[in-house]
Amino acid sequence: MHIHYNTNQTTLPLEISSFLPQDHLVFTIEKVVNTLEDSHFHAFYHAFGRPSYHPKMLVSTLLFAYSQGIFSGRKIEKMMVENLAMQYLTGQLVVSYRTINRFRVAEGMEELIRNLFIDLNLRLKMEELVTLDCLFIDGTKIEANANKYSFVWKKATEKFSAKLQEQIQVYFQEEITPLIHQAIELDTQEPISSEQLLAFAQVLEEELEKLNQDIEETPVKGKDERKTQRRKLKKVLRKVKDDFSVRAEKYESYQETFEGRNSFSKTDTDATFMRMKEDHMKNGQLKAAYNLQIATENQFVLHYDVFSNPTDTKTLLPFLETYPHDLKTVVADAGYGSEENLLRLDEKEVNHLIKYAMFDKEQKRGYKQSARNLGNWHYDNKEDSYTHPDGWCYRFHHIKHQKTQTDFQQEIKVYYADEPESAPQKGLYMNERYQNLKAKECQALLSPKGRQIFAQRKIDVEPVFGQIKACLGYKRCNLRGKRQVRIDMGLVLMANNLLKYNKRTNQN
């Protein structure tokens, strides 16, 4: 005896929502997206052409697809045909994958996702799921949608560009100048640009045209030296126009693309080659990637941004500048604890708990008793000198100023040993401002409240990366270009937020 079923019979009810459980994710997505103000969608309205799909419907379908770990436009279109929950969101419309992909990178999409995050943050605060008082910040590297062997290195570019300049100088002096009447003077101090080379090519073409005209007007029987000169001019013209100028233009475009970086990918020029944690070959191979920075509370991503530089130190200040709410407390690991970051946060009167590079080592008993610890040295305030536990004296000599890669000015006091030959180190370099900032930070981190808040960081921000990589399968970007990657990552993080929001609201 089996349960009766018939696939050819019409069934009731016909509303798709009645086939879905009441706590299904699509109802939460629909509620969150539909409550957005219509003004946020004005960029998607057009006064011409056939009626377009509603942007709220398209955003909802993208968020649901991303929440299921599906990122391909063709697979999203397939979901609209086969998936009942997706059919509920689309009203049983089937949107072409081309439309989906075009909408995903549309002009107003980045601003729309930003507004979606702001709206969800306020909703979470109203429902007391977050307070917006404390930001837990961390970063991860996501592999770019680029060929792993499409790298361009800054040092190699500078090396080959310098070689090209040498070749041009020699070639112009030996081959070009003797051939033409108009003398060409090259600046040996400044590099020759591709525009200058094209101008030289124009001069050569004019010279060649004059020579051709001269040969036609006054032909010579037998051997003609002018024809030999014409062959040489044609050869030189090809060299300048098709070789030197092309290579010079390529190196110039490379230098413009670097934008302070040491590498980029030809496939996705905004991506930088970074050392990834997933190193299956165990050879430290670099891959084109982006640095994703997120700020969370209660495992909800409140803010995110994408950077092309691999280190977290230089990302903190620009990341916080784009945060849409009031900054109160920032919690981050040792990758963010630079002098500039700590100083700027103090100037903005933002509370912060940020480890610095030596914090964990300073708490160990061996370091506290070590002679390397400056706390164990005797400091003479009058003479401005430090005395090593074994008796060597280091006296103040001068102040050294240096700039970081972000043009931040550091002031370092230099001390030299009285007996440099026998002393364990000849000099001592002291950044007093940074030492004071670190001492203040150490006191805050070791306080009972500081310990409690900082311990929360590991279970707040780091699980989010595991969820989007392991649960949603987002380990590689689906789009190319920094702007498009920012949209792509925003959809993934928002989908992860909505999964959590749906689960927690239905539990309550």
Task: Please place each PLM-identified region on the residue numbering.
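Hydrophobic alpha-helical membrane-insertion signals
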Residues: 1-27
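Anion-binding and metal-coordination hotspots
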Residues: 2-4, 62, 70-82, 93-508
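Short hydrophobic "helix-edge" motifs at membrane interfaces and signal-peptide entry regions
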Residues: 13-14, 44, 85-87, 128-129, ...
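Basic, short loop/linker segments at the boundary and entry of helix-turn-helix/winged-helix-like folds
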Residues: 22-63
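Short helix-loop boundary/capping segments at the starts of domains
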Residues: 34-42, 66-71, 82-89
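Catalytic micro-motifs at enzyme active sites that drive phosphoryl/nucleotidyl and oxygen chemistry
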Residues: 48, 86-91, 122
